[in-house]
């Protein structure tokens, strides 16, 4: 459901009421419809019926209730009770309004002394009551994309219809600052400097104001800011708790720190909130050193782009930061860390425990031991092992053998002067505690995709925080594609400090519902959430989401036919939908397949990426290939494995904003039976 600004005048026509209703209901939430908003340009005032602001430009719509009329390139003769009345070509009128707004945007940019960007625009006239058999004739006279009819405003057509009014060579995404400039031209008081567009709930999370912040006069130069207490930062919503009432695990991180967790469903704007919070703190406390941490380098690059121009904010991913700290301190010559999974596979023939439990199971167990910072064999034998489900249990003897493997792994690495990713975090903590490393300290650290940060990672983050520093995190447990840890396991007390974003806006309703079908009944996920006193967030009001086409589940009978299909489809989508190639993506489950797809698709600029690297990225079109490879390598009794596979699939499906293609070789696996009612099937 689109945001609507303004209202129709009392004497508005039935057609104008009908069009507004269709736009409000069928356009997505991230579009804004301005109703009868005057455009002021020098001494001229234009009054278009509707202005639609999107993330790829603006569209002017004029509405005509005409039913019987004749048209040529310049005029229309409209039948009325008073006879024929001549009207100027309304398409020309809509075009003039679009040009007026373009010039007004340039004038606004000059006034506030910023460069004037190119803003794509379109225009059209809507004829809600023209009989269907007249459509072709009218389109021939005034242009196919310049005239719209009632069916063009239906839920499955409206996005394509309005986008099609913009010339294909003009279409390109516009920045948030540009959108703010356009908003500020229409309503001058809405011009802002940071360019972040948030809905009401997101804005509350970003702009929660501390006691110290209220006291600062905005027009005065900002003095060196005193560090706010944890209680002050969240005084509006959280009653201060005595720190000695916190459990021991919470005190490890919480003591002296303000902790904030924003938990949201897929596509609810969690990252927008994080970006807004980082900019807000940077602006209010200019002497703070702020660190924004991403899960991987792809997300870090996107966040860095959004936060450029903020010199007090450092944006990176944790692996890169540790590498810089360690090599700067000359701890040792950097050797790219080993993958424990590869080490286990290389030793499968030597150890019966690997053969019995499987490589993936044993590798996950070795990682878990290190990530929860188990420090001895005795502790591992005694610790309660959670996260594996009830159908598979590890005996004490098997634990003993697994710990033997871990010690052998350590011995081999020490002999070869190597290190694993898991051990790197433990060594970092050891070196900091011993004084061998002196890492930089930050006043505030913000973590995106925090659900994938293991306890050892969070312990490292704590070492990077100044005493009394502030920790702000956003997460979604349903997208935890590695191991799941509760925040209590990670030493972070978030009870009473968690806020929720329940409204998804990124995907179409059809894509979101299909993705939800994969995980909504996952017993492992439900159990894990219940252990935190949480429940599964399924999205609040899906009726407000924009509608689109169902995902297409393609069953390929021949090996290799997937590449040919995708190449033909990306050309079709570019030609018919106007979607740029860089807004399309192919997701693969394994890296060895990347080269085969890139050979055919690299010339278009279509991104080809693996499922473990696509987290946090979004595209208009996603081709998710290789579904048949899921659920085949692990132990079917391993609840953690099955849940992990479902979350990977769910997260990858959620990367698609408009069109989603799911590709499966041969017969559809039983794991995907629940998808059938949410997709259209196609045999290739």
Predicted regions and their residues:
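Conserved P-loop NTPase-based nucleic-acid remodeling module centered on helicase motor cores
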Residues: 55, 63-98, 118, 136-147, ...
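Intrinsically disordered, low-complexity Ser/Thr/Pro/Gly-rich regulatory segments
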Residues: 1-48, 52-203, 208, 212-216
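Phosphate/oxyanion-binding active-site loops and adjacent basic polyanion-contact surfaces
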Residues: 11-16, 89-97, 198-201, 270, ...
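A general secondary-structure junction signal
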Residues: 37, 65, 125-129, 317-319, ...
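Conserved helicase motor core of SF1/SF2 NTP-dependent helicases
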Residues: 223-224, 228-245, 251-252, 260-336, ...
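Coupling/switch/interface segments within P-loop NTPase motor domains and analogous charged loops
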Residues: 122, 129, 334-420
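Pre-Walker A segment
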Residues: 155-266, 272-284
């Amino acid at each position: 459901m689109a945001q609507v600004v303004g209202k129709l005048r009392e004497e508005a026509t039935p057609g104008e009421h009908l069009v507004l209703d269709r736009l409000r209901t069928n356009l997505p939430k991230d579009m804004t419809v301005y109703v009868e908003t005057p455009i002021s340009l020098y001494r001229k005032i234009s009054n278009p019926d509707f202005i639609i602001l999107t993330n790829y430009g603006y569209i002017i719509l004029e509405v005509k209730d005409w039913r019987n009329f004749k048209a040529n390139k310049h005029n229309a003769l409209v039948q009325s009770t008073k006879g024929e009345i001549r009207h100027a070509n309304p398409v020309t009128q809509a075009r003039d309004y679009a040009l007026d707004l373009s010039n007004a945007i340039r004038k606004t940019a000059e006034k506030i002394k910023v460069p004037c960007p190119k803003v794509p625009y379109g225009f059209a006239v809507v004829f809600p009551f023209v009989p269907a058999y007249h459509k072709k004739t009218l389109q021939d006279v005034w242009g196919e994309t310049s005239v719209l009819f009632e069916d063009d405003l239906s839920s499955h057509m409206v996005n394509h219809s309005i986008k099609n009014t913009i010339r294909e060579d003009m279409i390109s995404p516009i920045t948030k600052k540009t959108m703010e400039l356009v908003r500020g031209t229409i309503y001058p008081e809405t011009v802002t400097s940071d360019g972040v567009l948030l809905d009401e709930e997101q804005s509350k999370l970003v702009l929660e104001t501390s006691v110290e912040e209220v006291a600062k006069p905005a027009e005065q130069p900002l003095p060196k800011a005193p560090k706010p207490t944890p209680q002050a930062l969240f005084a509006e919503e959280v009653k201060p708790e005595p720190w000695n009432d916190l459990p021991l695990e919470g005190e490890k991180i919480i003591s002296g720190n303000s902790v904030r967790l924003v938990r949201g469903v897929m596509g609810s704007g969690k990252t927008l909130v994080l970006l807004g919070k980082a900019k807000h703190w940077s602006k209010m406390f200019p002497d703070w050193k702020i660190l924004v941490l991403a899960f991987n380098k792809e997300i870090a690059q996107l966040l860095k782009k959004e936060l450029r121009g903020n010199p007090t904010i450092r944006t990176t991913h944790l692996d890169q930061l540790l590498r810089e700290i360690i090599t700067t301190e000359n701890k040792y010559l950097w050797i790219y860390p080993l993958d424990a999974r590869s080490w286990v596979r290389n030793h499968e023939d030597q150890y019966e425990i690997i053969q019995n439990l499987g490589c993936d199971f044993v590798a996950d167990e070795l990682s878990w031991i290190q990530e929860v910072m188990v420090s001895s064999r005795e502790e591992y034998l005694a610790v309660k092992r959670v996260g594996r489900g009830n159908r598979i249990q590890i005996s004490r003897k098997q634990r003993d053998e697994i710990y033997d493997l871990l010690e052998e792994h350590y011995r081999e690495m020490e002999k070869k002067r190597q290190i694993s990713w898991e051990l790197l975090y433990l060594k970092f903590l050891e070196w900091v505690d011993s004084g061998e490393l002196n890492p930089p300290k930050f006043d505030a650290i913000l973590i995106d995709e925090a659900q994938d940060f293991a306890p050892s990672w969070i312990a490292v983050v704590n070492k990077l925080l100044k005493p009394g520093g502030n920790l702000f995190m956003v997460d979604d447990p349903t997208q935890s594609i590695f191991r799941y840890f509760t925040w209590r396991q990670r030493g972070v007390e978030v009870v009473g400090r968690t806020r929720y974003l329940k409204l998804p806006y990124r995907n179409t309703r059809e894509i979101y519902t299909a993705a939800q079908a994969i995980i909504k009944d996952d017993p492992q996920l439900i159990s894990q959430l219940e252990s935190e006193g949480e429940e599964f967030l399924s999205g609040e009001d899906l009726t407000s989401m924009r509608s689109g086409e169902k995902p297409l589940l393609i069953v390929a009978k021949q090996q290799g036919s997937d590449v040919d299909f995708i190449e033909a489809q990306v050309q079709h989508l570019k030609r018919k939908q106007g979607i740029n190639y860089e807004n399309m993506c192919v997701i693969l489950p394994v890296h060895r397949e990347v080269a085969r797809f890139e050979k055919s698709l690299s010339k278009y600029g279509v991104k080809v990426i693996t499922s473990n690297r696509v987290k946090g990225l979004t595209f208009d079109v996603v081709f998710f290939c290789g579904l048949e490879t899921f659920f085949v390598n692990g132990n079917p009794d391993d609840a953690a494995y099955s849940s992990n596979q479902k979350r990977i699939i769910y997260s990858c499906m959620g990367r698609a904003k408009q069109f989603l293609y799911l590709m499966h070789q041969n017969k559809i696996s039983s794991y995907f039976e629940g998808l059938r009612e949410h997709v259209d099937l196609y045999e290739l």
